[in-house]
Amino acid sequence: MKNKISYLNDDRHTIKRVKRSNPILFIKTPYSREAMKKKYFKFYLIHGFTTGYISRSGTLENKKKNLSFKKSKKNLNSYLNSLNKDGADQVNDENVQNEENDENQENDENQENDEYEENYDDEENQGNDEYEENESVENHFESDSEKGDFEEMDQTWKTNEKDNEKSDNNDNGDENNEKTKPNQQLQFIGLHRKKENQDEDSNKTKEIEQQQQNQKQQQVNDEDCSSNKQSNSFSGNVLAFGNMILKGLSFSDLTGNNNNNNINNNNNNNNKNNTNTNYTNNVVVNDNICEKDKENTQDQQTNTVTVSTTIINTTTTSTTSENSNTIDKSNDSINESGISSLDESNNSTSGDLISSNSSSFSSMDDI
């Protein structure tokens, strides 16, 4: 029994007894009749927050004074009345004051514990084990009046327990009523799940409609982009020392040289090595392009445009170079004014270089 911690639990209360080397009990709530009958709790029902230790006669020792059973009973009645009225665990002012006093006197009590422990151990050595086995709650009554007070208190507990049982039965009755109507519950569950399925189908329908709408919008955007390309076809003049006007491209002020590109032309069975003349062309941009064409803007800015013209008798070779890619075109005619024109439809030249609306481009690869 020495240096042992004892715990007692029931459905509403927890009681802790610390080891006997420091025999102080912390009693926080009133506990049931079954708990009172345990042999290692040799004290009567004490209500409130109380600190102390137990004497061999079964009374709670606190400041070397015995707390009378009547006082503890009075506190218990106040507690039970508060439960009946408010339905909550309330502690009266007297017990709160007792708790404060106990906390202030804790050091004094600890000093008394050593002396008490010695006396307690002496009593245990004098056949206390046999006494504890045969003891009962009645053995601790010091008088008939005290026993009567206990029976009255016990009856109070029984009355309150009956009230609690009635309350529990009412709760069980409500549960039984619910069990007698399973169809209503099943009907509610069915309606709830049906509503969930309807909501899920509605969400799927909305998602499909949104996808269709996005596809239609994308198709319209593609058509607008294609139409925009056709309207931005090449139209302008290319002069030997002039300006090149381009529409539908996303770069401007582009200059380029076709340096040291040699073109071999056979004319009248004579091999002649002709060096192209370099020109600088100013590019004027009409920034009217589609969104997806703008993705190639950075790549287009690295391209160069060079227009070179070589006149050999009546034969002109026009070369367009893009990133060292050379395209030779022969048998193109040039007039005396030095203005070269190219018709994309029949590869003939006369005057201005004008393309039809059917040809369009958005990058230098189309030139």
Swiss-Prot record:
Residues 97-231, 316-367 are annotated as: Disordered. Residues 332-347 have a biased composition (Polar residues). Residues 137-150, 159-169 have a biased composition (Basic and acidic residues). It comes from the Eukaryota. Signal peptide: none annotated. Residues 97-136 have a biased composition (Acidic residues). Residues 210-219, 316-328, 348-367 have a biased composition (Low complexity). This is Uncharacterized protein DDB_G0290803. It comes from Dictyostelium discoideum.
